[in-house]
UniProtKB/Swiss-Prot annotation:
Organism listed in the record: Burkholderia thailandensis (strain ATCC 700388 / DSM 13276 / CCUG 48851 / CIP 106301 / E264)
Family statement: Belongs to the HrcA family.
The gene coding this protein: hrcA
Alphabetic keyword roster: Repressor, Stress response, Transcription, Transcription regulation
Recorded GO MF terms: DNA binding
Protein's name in the database: Heat-inducible transcription repressor HrcA
Domain of life of the organism encoding this protein: Bacteria
NCBIfam families per UniProt: hrcA (TIGR00331)
């Protein structure tokens, strides 16, 4: 445990380093900490913090910078989340951008853009898993023996499938089949529909049964549980010296964006937690770059967590500003999707 004096100096050091991006010396700490301490006393405290692994000394400077462990202590125990921007203005902007009634994919993509614009870093969203369950289906006759199957999920996502049939169906027959399925099976997975059809096959005409089996087969041909990572504002990170000053680091950063595997893993872990999570590079093995941090929060549809969103930026980010941006966006995205 740190004593109050050491906590104050560590908090001041991290706040000044986030603001200025330069190693922090004893004179700066004396000026901003509010403590009446001699430079020698401050240097002694800094040496103690360095032994604890909370700060380090760059070879080219007499000042010190926070380590990942120091950042972790700061965000867990010292951070006061008071956004310098008007939270009401943020709320209005997010509400204006996230329009209820729009396709789910468009709303989720808009959330990534909002996060990027507000944070000036990269916004990232893990899209909801494709639903195994359907809310409504419709058959549309395209030509002889070719039918378009339209599937509407409970989240409002619309999926289309092509069905090749053994015979021609009239529009009236297609309406009859879709009405039967919607009346008896809406809210179930297509695997469950398949099982139910086996038990109810005697109640249906053979041609209707064949059409329904074709619909079930078509609906399950594509993976239902694929997740996608949407990223907006990657180019903002080119303006961040901490991430872009080294070409190898920059190449690794864009490899992360291109492959998305590590981001998918990190966001998936975040979806199992409540509230805002902070992953600090160099401390969390989930963050692939030491100088990068990710602030995430899960979002919901009708009370059920379906995905995660967040901001990717430098470890030296204004956490007190980014955290409320992520939190407000997650809450309003949840509200918008639940109104679909």
């Amino acid at each position: 445990m740190l004593d109050p004096r050491a906590r104050t100096l560590l908090k001041t050091l991290i706040e000044r380093y986030i603001a200025d991006g330069q190693p922090v010396g004893s004179r700066t700490l004396s000026r901003y900490s509010g403590l009446e301490l001699s430079p020698a006393t401050i240097r002694n405290v800094m040496s103690d913090l360095e032994e604890l692994g909370l700060v380090s000394s760059p070879h080219t400077s007499a000042g010190r910078v926070p380590t990942p462990r120091g950042y972790r202590l700061f965000v867990d125990t010292m951070l006061t989340v008071e956004s310098p921007i008007d939270s009401d203005a943020v709320t209005r902007l997010v509400q204006t951008t996230l329009q209820a009634g729009e396709p789910q994919q468009k709303v989720v993509a808009a959330a990534a853009s909002v996060l990027s614009n507000l944070s000036q870093f990269a916004g990232v969203v893990l899209t909801p898993r494709r639903s195994h369950v359907f809310k409504q289906i419709e058959f549309l006759r395209l030509s002889d023996k070719r039918i378009l199957l339209i599937i509407v999920t409970p989240e409002g996502d619309v999926q289309n499938r092509m069905i090749a049939t053994q015979r021609d169906y009239s529009p009236a027959q297609l309406t009859e089949a879709s009405n039967y399925i919607n009346a008896h099976f809406a809210g179930l997975s297509f695997d469950e529909v398949r099982r139910r059809l086996r038990g109810e096959i005697d109640e249906l005409r053979g041609d209707m049964t064949a059409l329904m089996h074709a619909a079930v087969t078509a609906s399950t041909e594509e993976p239902a549980d694929e997740e996608t990572v949407l990223i907006s504002g990657e180019r903002n990170l080119l303006e961040v010296a901490d991430l872009s000053s080294d070409m190898a680091r920059l190449r690794k950063l864009f490899d992360v964006f291109d492959q998305k595997t590590s981001l998918l893993q990190l966001l998936d872990v975040s979806s199992h937690a409540q509230g805002v999570q902070i992953f600090i590079g160099g401390e969390s093995t989930l963050v692939p770059i030491d100088e990068m941090s990710v602030v995430t929060a899960p979002y919901e549809v009708n009370g059920k967590i379906v995905g995660t969103l967040g901001v990717i930026g430098p470890t030296r980010m204004a956490y007190n500003r980014v955290i409320p941006i992520v939190d407000i966006t997650a809450r309003l995205l949840s509200l918008t999707l639940s109104q679909q």
